[in-house]
């Protein structure tokens, strides 16, 4: 897992652990890592006829080129979710938990008049495909709204201070201008907690509609359309959403003389740039502008393409798995670019172990849970797949704080083996905890796992003066059926496991000599009479972290090291760094092999300094052999592998 001298590592670990204990919110992985936001969903409606007043979807790989889904037909039936038979102005938000989505809509058909609606629609989803909806009629739900004329363009933002979702919208009462109001949604997102309250009224006290709020650096920016003699888009800012204290910017932000409305702002993925777009409704088109400061905007219309004509909508950054769900449901647009399959897991993970289960006929990845400051994670997860490209999070399988009595920190570098004992499949899961190695067992590859109750390896082998007892690898020799445990940072140790797989055969521990490139992460495979020993060189925080190999005629060595023995290393020109700590998968009954490994998270890991070494992601590429049995150097890719059948 890590590659530094033991004394330095121990100091850093203890310091990191102490800091984490003092502040358990520090260095916790986000619900959604920005590096996993790789595409965009555009939610919109198309016009003023009843058929056009419905939610439609489009997708983009880069935020500039958009392709409609479902043949540009509605993805939600307006008649089912609304009181008027039509909906407009869709706004979509990713929830604070990262996995729940909230959409709000104007409940209105324009054919009945611009003052005909009193309601909005609230929707909630966990997959962007299936939505639960509720109608909120302001006039009937809250007394005192008899003079309410219309409810327009609702939107949602998470108010971290209140811990609630704030819905804001414009209301117009008889004899008065449109003003922007707000109310908090109830816990189920099916209604409002209270009657609407004023959120914002411009100094001009003239009408304002189509509010859109985005937070940047602790400041909330409210973009809105003002209905003065010179209508257009302006912005006001505050540090407290509901304080009523807004600072207005008098400048107009639209970059056209044509009439505009329905502004919306989103941040480009893995970028400092923001896009402000708005509906040029008098010309039937959209305009896109770009900014870094949310004050100065440049038109980028020449960079934008769409194969549809949207009206007022919003754009949501989405992950690859979310994109795939949309495509599975509504099809892949003909011109949409090929989707990369690396990294194979979303989120921060490292030290991947991969297994094919003969019991379930599925593939499993067992990684280190990464993204914690100083490698301070304390639980392990597993992920399953039928095709090696689409992975399901199976949840936590070992939590050191709950499931292990002998250690509660630094959950690192697991490995697993499937053994058939007395006709039943058993799974033995070896893991590092607090620089010791333990083992847990289960009847299923996704658990639950039961810890053995004590560390399997807790001290250095005899004669070893430095390093750490980490990075276990388990290998069953197909020639003898014996199973071996390998481990070590700074040294490579091996011991034969007893038949129970949870204890080491007495007197079997030995040190295998490797060259100076060995640091950690031993992995052993067998192919056509040859044992291949793979290991990682350098420090996991180093951009030069890589995998090398040697061969042997025995699982106990000695190891012969080829002249050109790099298995995989980074490609700086492609932003790929620190490709290491691997495992290898052989497709059952085939001479077909794949290597899983971690790398710095792309594209920002290389900019993180040492933190890049605990913000890693898991990738997979094909592993091939030359005719003489030597390993071809793997070229790491962003595209990854194609799904297997």
Residue ranges and their predicted role:
Residues 1-26:
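Bacterial Sec-dependent N-terminal signal peptides
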């Amino acid at each position: 897992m890590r590659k530094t001298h033991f004394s330095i590592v121990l100091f850093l670990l203890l310091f990191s652990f102490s800091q984490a204990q003092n502040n358990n919110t520090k260095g916790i992985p986000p619900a959604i890592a920005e590096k996993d936001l790789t595409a965009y969903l555009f939610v919109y409606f198309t016009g003023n006829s009843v058929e056009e007043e419905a939610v439609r979807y489009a997708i983009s790989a880069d935020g500039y080129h958009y392709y409609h889904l479902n043949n540009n037909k509605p993805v939600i039936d307006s008649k089912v979710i609304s009181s008027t038979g039509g909906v407009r102005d869709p706004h979509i938000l990713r929830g604070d938990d990262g996995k729940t989505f909230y959409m709000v809509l104007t409940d209105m058909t324009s054919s009945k008049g611009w003052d005909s609606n009193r309601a909005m629609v609230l929707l909630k989803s966990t997959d962007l495909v299936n939505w639960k909806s509720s109608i909120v009629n302001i006039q009937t739900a809250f007394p005192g709204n008899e003079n309410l004329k219309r409810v327009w363009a609702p939107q949602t933002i998470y108010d971290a201070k209140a811990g609630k979702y704030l819905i804001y919208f414009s209301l117009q009462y008889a004899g008065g201008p449109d003003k922007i109001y707000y109310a908090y949604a109830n816990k189920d997102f099916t209604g409002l907690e209270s009657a609407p309250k004023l959120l914002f009224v411009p100094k001009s006290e003239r009408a304002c509609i189509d509010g859109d709020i985005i937070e940047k650096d602790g400041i909330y920016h409210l973009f809105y359309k003002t209905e003065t003699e010179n209508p257009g888009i302006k912005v006001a800012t505050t540090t407290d959403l509901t304080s009523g204290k807004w600072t207005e910017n008098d400048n107009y932000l639209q970059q056209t003389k044509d009439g505009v409305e329905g502004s919306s702002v989103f941040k480009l993925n893995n970028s400092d740039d923001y896009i402000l777009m708005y509906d040029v409704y008098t010309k039937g088109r959209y305009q896109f502008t770009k900014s870094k400061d949310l004050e100065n905007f440049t038109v980028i219309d020449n960079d934008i393409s769409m194969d549809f004509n949207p009206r007022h909508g919003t754009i949501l950054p989405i992950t690859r798995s979310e994109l795939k769900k949309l495509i599975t449901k509504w099809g892949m647009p003909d011109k949409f670019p090929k989707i990369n399959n690396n990294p194979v897991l979303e989120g921060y993970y490292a030290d991947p172990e991969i297994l094919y289960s003969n019991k379930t006929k599925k593939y499993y990845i067992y990684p280190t849970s990464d993204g914690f400051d100083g490698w301070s994670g304390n639980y392990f997860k597993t992920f399953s797949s039928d095709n090696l490209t689409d992975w399901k999070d199976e949840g936590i399988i070992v939590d050191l704080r709950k499931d292990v009595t002998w250690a509660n920190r630094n959950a690192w570098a697991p490995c697993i083996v499937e053994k058939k004992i007395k006709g039943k499949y058993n799974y033995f899961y070896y893991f590092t905890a607090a620089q010791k190695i333990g083992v847990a067992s289960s009847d299923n590859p996704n658990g639950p796992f039961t810890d053995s109750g004590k560390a399997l390896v807790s001290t250095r082998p005899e004669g070893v003066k430095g390093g750490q007892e980490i990075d276990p690898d388990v290998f069953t020799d197909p020639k003898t059926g014996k199973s071996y445990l390998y481990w070590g940072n700074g040294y490579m140790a091996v011991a034969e496991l007893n038949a129970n797989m949870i204890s080491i055969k007495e007197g079997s521990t030995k040190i295998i000599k490797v060259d100076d490139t060995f640091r950690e992460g031993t992995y052993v495979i067998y192919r056509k009479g040859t044992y291949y020993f793979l290991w990682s060189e350098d420090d996991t925080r180093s951009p030069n972290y890589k995998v090398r190999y040697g061969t042997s005629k025995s699982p106990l060595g000695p190891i012969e090291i080829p002249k050109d023995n790099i298995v995989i290393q980074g490609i700086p020109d492609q932003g790929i760094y620190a490709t290491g700590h691997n495992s290898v998968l052989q497709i059952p009954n085939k001479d077909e092999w794949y290597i899983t490994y971690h790398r710095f998270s792309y594209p920002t890991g290389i900019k993180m300094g040492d933190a890049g070494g605990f913000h890693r992601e898991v990738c997979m590429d094909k592993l091939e052999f030359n005719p003489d049995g030597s390993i071809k150097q793997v070229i790491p890719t962003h595209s990854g592998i194609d799904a297997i059948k």
